[in-house]
Amino acid sequence: MKKILLTNDDGYHAKGIKALEQALEEMAEIYVVAPKHEKSACSQCITITAPLRAEKIKGKEGRHYRIDDGTPSDCVYLAINELFKHVCFDLVISGINLGSNMGEDTIYSGTVAGAIEGTIQGVPSIAISQILSNKNKNTPLSFDLAQKIIQDLVQNIFKNGYPLKGRKLLNVNVPNCSLQEYKGERITPKGYRLYKKEVHKRTDPKNESYFWLGLHPLEWQKRENEDRLSDFDAIASNHASITPLNLDLTSYDDLKSLESWHEGMLK
């Protein structure tokens, strides 16, 4: 039977990872290693200056752990190299995240980092995120669509193989709409996320200042010389976005011009 490792950055008790396990439990043998507490926007952080404690969850056949103060990268690293080192995983899936991970947000994302760590460890990996919307904030969030999308993706991977070669992963974002409103998947590049420069300053009861970061509206624009719809555009039209991500961050288009620039510096 196929074996899938699940993680997330919302924490072991988050609704998203429970929905993910529920969606896949009849398709594969499921293992879960997730942070004990929320670790959103922790990026690829891995713990090397403090010990990690792994708590085995009772009643889960020894396949569930939560990592005290661990990050998603910690969880995947520890799962593959120690907790389940005799298990050959077919997939690592990180999610279902509460909120989008599109454009440059993928660099900050703990959810995407969990899938990146799986890729680094040599396992085909997927990050999946559920878009939240202010207009639906008074409606209970449903993972029905995200569950269907991940089921279809995993089924296709098990049947036809993982679609990417090398150190690459799939990043999936699911629109906040019903199954009836859903228009299908789009293969997209990352969009260009627009960030504000605001910092929200507050004062506590002791009259000391504290700050909130990251409270930015979801705004974007097209990248230069890119005609294809981005992940943002797909979501805006009730499509899911599926974006291939590469761990190699080298800007190959700039290597020659950088060499020329450097030669000029040496003269």
From Swiss-Prot:
<dbReference type="GO" id="GO:0046872">
    <property type="term" value="F:metal ion binding"/>
</dbReference>
<keyword id="KW-0963">Cytoplasm</keyword>
<dbReference type="GO" id="GO:0004309">
    <property type="term" value="F:exopolyphosphatase activity"/>
</dbReference>
<keyword id="KW-0479">Metal-binding</keyword>
<dbReference type="InterPro" id="IPR030048">
    <property type="entry name" value="SurE"/>
</dbReference>
<dbReference type="Pfam" id="PF01975">
    <property type="entry name" value="SurE"/>
</dbReference>
<keyword id="KW-0378">Hydrolase</keyword>
<protein>
    <recommendedName>
        <fullName>5'-nucleotidase SurE</fullName>
        <ecNumber>3.1.3.5</ecNumber>
    </recommendedName>
</protein>
<comment type="similarity">
    <text>Belongs to the SurE nucleotidase family.</text>
</comment>
<feature type="binding site">
    <location>
        <position position="40"/>
    </location>
    <ligand>
        <name>a divalent metal cation</name>
    </ligand>
</feature>
<feature type="binding site">
    <location>
        <position position="97"/>
    </location>
    <ligand>
        <name>a divalent metal cation</name>
    </ligand>
</feature>
<dbReference type="GO" id="GO:0005737">
    <property type="term" value="C:cytoplasm"/>
</dbReference>
<dbReference type="InterPro" id="IPR002828">
    <property type="entry name" value="SurE-like_Pase/nucleotidase"/>
</dbReference>
<keyword id="KW-0547">Nucleotide-binding</keyword>
<dbReference type="GO" id="GO:0000166">
    <property type="term" value="F:nucleotide binding"/>
</dbReference>
<feature type="binding site">
    <location>
        <position position="10"/>
    </location>
    <ligand>
        <name>a divalent metal cation</name>
    </ligand>
</feature>
<dbReference type="GO" id="GO:0008254">
    <property type="term" value="F:3'-nucleotidase activity"/>
</dbReference>
<feature type="binding site">
    <location>
        <position position="9"/>
    </location>
    <ligand>
        <name>a divalent metal cation</name>
    </ligand>
</feature>
<dbReference type="GO" id="GO:0008253">
    <property type="term" value="F:5'-nucleotidase activity"/>
</dbReference>
<dbReference type="InterPro" id="IPR036523">
    <property type="entry name" value="SurE-like_sf"/>
</dbReference>
<comment type="function">
    <text>Nucleotidase that shows phosphatase activity on nucleoside 5'-monophosphates.</text>
</comment>
